[in-house]
Amino acid sequence: IVLYTYILYDVDELMYREEFMNIICFGDSITRGYDVREGLGWVELCSAALPAYHMENHGIDGLSVQGLINYLESWCIDKSYEENRYICIMCGTNDILQNRDSDYVYNKLIKAATIAGEKGHVILGLETQIDSEMDGLNHVVVDVNRRLQDYALEHGLQTIDFYTVLHEADQIGQIVFAGEVHPNERGYRLMAYKALETFTRL
């Protein structure tokens, strides 16, 4: 799998920039890379494509948005703000599957983003769809993502639209999910392509 085509900078310039880039990814099993072999999740694919970046994957299976807040609070205790640190957060599917509404999920994610913003630049990942509109829950994902995009625009934050890249592939008949929630190898690869569009332009 070659993802280097997304590195569009002059090579010398990019390598100079890479040496100072720290990208820390927090989220649930979709961030961790559930349902594919080790190394084939989107974070690991990005890390392989950007070998001079320092990237960390803090994805946790089953993580809720409150769990994300708790984890971030613990992680942040001994950290100071760093200009070269980018903190990517994506979470919410597990709460939506437990019938939490969009207000609950959105407000918790904004709290998480506020905590993360005290330690670095925040990137908001837009959660992927709940495939096949299981129990009508996907509309909650769409609403949360829309509100996150509005918040990011208002506050000058970057987003990674994982939802659209998988939804569009799904709509044209590509198989990008391993089940109702988790992407398959192709899905994670598309997510990595999308993330690299942002990461290579930081």
Task: Enumerate the predicted regions with their spans.
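Compositionally biased, intrinsically disordered low-complexity regions
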Residues: 1, 5-8, 13, 110, ...
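Intrinsically disordered, low-complexity segments enriched in small/polar residues
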Residues: 2-7, 14, 51, 84, ...
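A generic signature of intrinsically disordered, low-complexity regions enriched in glycine/proline
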Residues: 8-16, 32, 62, 98-99, ...
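Alpha-helical cap/lid subdomain in secreted, periplasmic
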Residues: 70-202
